[in-house]
Amino acid sequence: MAKDAITGARTRFGNQRSHALNSSRRSWKPNLQKVTVKINGAAAKKVYLTARTLKAGLKNGSIERV
């Protein structure tokens, strides 16, 4: 599985708990998107970013979509 190029977000693992508090393993996957961007004015590059990182970067100007 890929990871976020900026924050390093990866799949997280934990337990799923039923009402009886039985546990079974489960995972939470980040919402990764493959996008072509310029990060801090560098050359355009295809990277994996979470939707959250992409939204924040576009808003504060550190990421520019190509």
Curated annotation (Swiss-Prot):
Residues 1-26 are annotated as: Disordered. One of its GO terms (molecular function) is structural constituent of ribosome. Keywords: Ribonucleoprotein, Ribosomal protein. GO terms for biological process: translation. SUPFAM superfamilies: L28p-like. Residues 13-25 have a biased composition (Polar residues). GO terms for cellular component: ribonucleoprotein complex; ribosome. HAMAP family: Ribosomal_bL28. Belongs to the bacterial ribosomal protein bL28 family. This is Large ribosomal subunit protein bL28. The lineage of its organism: Bacteria, Bacillati, Bacillota, Bacilli, Lactobacillales. The gene is rpmB.
